[in-house]
């Protein structure tokens, strides 16, 4: 299947046998960094409430199982021991591109289901585009930050931009707030952080810099908040039922989703949400990264 498309309506059933139940897999370790999600890992009570609310909407029993990290969760998916998985965007896309899972819905937080990685500078700094960078001091969040390091660097590689030419001093500041302050105080010429996008996926509606006056130098995305992915072993009719139940939630499922994922709702995962990130996937430099949380580091 590869990455030929994300919408289950366009796929043939890969399994003819209806499942007896649906097994939801989650990584239980608290997140290292979360934007809009929970600051702690999921609880058993929250997982149970979500499963109870989803079950009558899909007409199947729904159970949950916790895993130590995403590698263990994906291994269970590959063995056929889990059917659904909450995944960070990069993990979800790699699994989908390998033909193992299918992204089906994205959670909405703060009115949006995605964000972007933005490279920004102070207003009036004289840097207006990526071509203006020559030995610039750059502020990163940390080596595991999707928006604050990984994605914008991957995008720059895809544009054949030479890091050794563009950047001089490179510093990890540990948080998005610290990156913003480093740029605004003049400690760094540019910094990388998150920016929430409007529904057109082009315009910034809010960002880590708040109301400060900044100049966006480059932006890469959209990046989904996180992704509910289904095993390709599930019949497409079951995947559609799960997708439709989450997109058109009843009150019980809405409350359970808010409790578990801090989600206001869900949208169906479409190719337009995923393809920009897929294009830079091979340029990522996160080899050996071990993600552990139900909510992705951003």
Question: What would you call each of these model-derived segments?
Answer:
Residues 137-139, 143-237:
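Pocket-lining segment of extracytoplasmic ligand-binding domains
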Residues 71-85, 98, 131, 175-196:
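Short helices/loops that flank or line small-molecule/ion binding pockets
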Residues 94-120:
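Glycine/small-residue-rich loop that forms an oxyanion/phosphate-binding "nest" at active or ligand-binding sites
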Residues 19-23, 27-29, 110-121, 206-243, ...:
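Periplasmic-binding protein-like
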Residues 29, 90-91, 122-124, 143, ...:
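Solvent-exposed coil/turn segments that connect beta secondary-structure elements
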């Amino acid at each position: 299947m590869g990455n030929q498309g994300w919408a289950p309506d366009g796929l043939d059933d890969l399994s003819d046998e209806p499942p007896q139940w649906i097994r939801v897999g989650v990584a239980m370790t608290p997140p290292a960094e979360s934007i809009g999600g929970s600051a702690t890992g999921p609880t058993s009570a929250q997982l149970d409430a979500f499963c109870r609310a989803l079950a009558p909407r899909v007409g199947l029993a729904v159970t949950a199982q916790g895993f130590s990290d995403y590698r263990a969760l994906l291994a269970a998916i590959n063995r056929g021991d889990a059917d659904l998985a909450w995944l960070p965007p990069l993990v979800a896309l790699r699994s989908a591109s390998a033909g193992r899972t299918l992204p089906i819905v994205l959670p909405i937080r703060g009115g949006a289901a995605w964000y972007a990685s933005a490279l920004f500078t102070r207003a009036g700094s004289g840097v207006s585009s990526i071509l203006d960078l020559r030995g610039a001091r750059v502020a990163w969040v940390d080596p595991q930050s999707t928006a604050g390091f990984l994605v914008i660097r991957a995008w720059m590689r895809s544009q054949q931009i030479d890091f050794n030419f563009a950047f001089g001093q490179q510093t990890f500041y540990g948080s998005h707030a610290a990156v913003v302050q480093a740029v605004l105080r003049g400690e760094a010429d540019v910094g990388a952080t998150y920016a929430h996008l409007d529904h057109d996926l082009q315009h910034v509606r809010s960002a880590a810099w708040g109301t400060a006056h900044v100049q966006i130098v480059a932006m890469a995305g959209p990046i989904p908040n996180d992704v509910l992915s289904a095993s390709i072993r599930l019949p497409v009719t079951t995947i559609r039922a799960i997708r439709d139940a989450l997109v058109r939630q009843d009150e019980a499922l809405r409350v359970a989703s808010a409790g578990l994922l801090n989600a206001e709702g869900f949208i169906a995962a479409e190719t337009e949400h995923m393809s920009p990130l897929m294009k830079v996937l091979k340029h990522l430099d996160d080899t050996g990264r071990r993600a552990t949380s139900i909510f992705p580091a951003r």
